[in-house]
Amino acid sequence: MKGFIILLLSLSCSISMAQENMPLSNSHVIKPNIVYILADDLGIGDVSGLNPEAKVNTPNIDKLIHNGMTFTDAHTTSSVCTPSRYSIMTGEYAWRTKLKGRVLDGYSKALIEEDKDTAPKLLQRNGYETAMIGKWHLGWNWQFKTEETFEMDPKNPYQFKEDISDKVDYSKPFTGGPTDCGFDYFFGLNASLDFPPYVYSENNKLITIPTATMKPDGKDKNFPGGRKKDLVGGQKLKRKGDKAPDFKAEQV
């Protein structure tokens, strides 16, 4: 099987979905590997291959520019994370959901409905193995320690009105996340790097229980909340970057 890996650091693009059951290509044609990289706040002038005076050299991106095609007139469905991610996954505007503004946090319910078709589901139907490494930020459904129900925020129907962080059973798998939306493998964080809980997830479970607390120190502007005991702000991206080549190497 060919591999499709999506590295979600943040969203600045959108896609259109193909018809639900339309094959991507003839079954006899070799399908290419697909690597979809999304970067936050990256302008044309930030890439050295497009701007010789760029502040940072980007040799690997420059190789893609010199050996491929470059599009410089792109548009996104939103200027913030959650709605633009929703559009990439589903091909729809996020305002078609009940989320009419703002973004989700680390404890929000799943934004993508169970029966909603997505780009990775389309690829799975066409013989691809799919993976996502990085920031999800589309919500998922936590399991709780009790059968208690919690009131939702009237301004955001996917977000709880009260702090439910101590109500979550972090040892149980969650639903509605990447592996329920078309990805065979997931490694990363539920929401933005500044939202708790500050722990990594693999597939549909946390890889560790948040036993410490992240506190803003004036430099790392995180919302206070649970974190992995030995996790500090500067480490949050590193391990996700280490995981991506592993999946690609296994699929090629």
In which residue ranges do the predicted regions lie?
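Formylglycine-dependent sulfatase
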Residues: K2, A18-V252
